[in-house]
Amino acid sequence: MPPDLPRFSLRLHQGLTPQACRALAASAEAHGFHTLWFAENPFGRAILPAVAACAADTSRVRLGLGILNPYQHHPTLIAQEAAVLDELSGGRVRLGIGSGIAQRIAQLGTRYRPLAALTDAVQIVRGLLRHETVTYRGRAFSADRVALEFAAPRPDMPIHLAAMADRSLALCGRLADGLIVSNLCPPAYTARAVAIVRESAAVAERESFDIVQYLPCAARPDGAEAREIAKEAVGAMLIALWPTGNDWPAQRETILRLSGIARPEMVGALDRLRRGERAGRVLDDRFISGFALAGTAEQVIAQAAQYRRVGADELALSFAGPQPAADAAYLARAVKRLIPDGELAIDVRRSPPDSG
């Protein structure tokens, strides 16, 4: 019997040019991936031009804005952008909102208030998509008698929130339709986050909730080669995303505890990586099993099933290495061999282009 698998999607990072995104979008649609999630952080490539180009190039694959932060995209602008992209794509947009990376938001010269920012953004965006005239006074963002001057194609467009800390996860359950679990979060953390979100959603009487997990992935016929590629990807993410210094946010301490990696080991690994040592020499297999999918296609599928067991409905995979389209196609073919009747989590052609 085939394993219970999550949906498989692609995450397109900001290191990719719009032209590269278009090529990957065509490949993803041809091989049946569910969604293209476009990642945006301050000061990298803005995602909206690539999303628009990919919307025009494709007809089935969904397009995830994952994520827009309200400090750079005011909530009124998020509603405008999401609605117009939904028009362009024929209703294929999936909206993700997050508070952004604290250190980078600080560079904008604005006060970082993640809970307030998420709350205000969801309230304003929902009202505008419903074609309401929104007057809202928030702690971070406000709107005064604002209405879209056109009707959004889907007034009930689902909203996913990127959240990590416990209070943000609880907020996500109360207000949103889905959670985006960030990179560098092991399965045990995902299980814990899912429990917090679903408990909060139940209290708010929200019945359905979608869990999307971001993960780097390396799938190759040579499993050892794939694991080395994955180490380089995880190493780059640790350098970019893990806080410097010793004063780590509580959620990072929780992630570390649930990964099985001791704090001194992580501190030592970060120091060596930041001094330029190659990740293949620094990181052992625990960093790969905790923070990536890696190996042959069959091994990656087994690892993906583990995330499904802890509550992830969808994996948005960043394919590491020099040939992401080929590696993604290799994995897709293996999934289709495993579930040959076409009823597979990876296939979008049998379902309508709604939120997923």
Predicted feature locations:
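An alpha-helical appendage that flanks or caps ligand/catalytic pockets
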Residues: 2, 111-148, 190, 199-309, ...
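N-terminal beta1-alpha1-beta2 module of alpha/beta enzyme domains
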Residues: 1-65, 157, 348-350
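Active-site mouth loops of central-metabolism enzymes
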Residues: 6-19, 68-76, 153-164, 217-220, ...
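Alpha-helix-loop-beta-strand connector modules within alpha/beta enzyme cores
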Residues: 45-68, 72, 121-124, 128, ...
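Hydrophobic faces of well-ordered beta-strands that scaffold small-molecule active sites
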Residues: 6-12, 36-38, 63-66, 93-97, ...
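Short, acidic/polar
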Residues: 16-28, 78-81, 161-171, 230-233, ...
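Conserved, mostly hydrophobic/aromatic
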Residues: 28, 32, 54, 85, ...
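Glycine-rich, proline-tolerant flexible connector loops at the mouths of alpha/beta enzymes
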Residues: 35-57, 69, 101, 105, ...
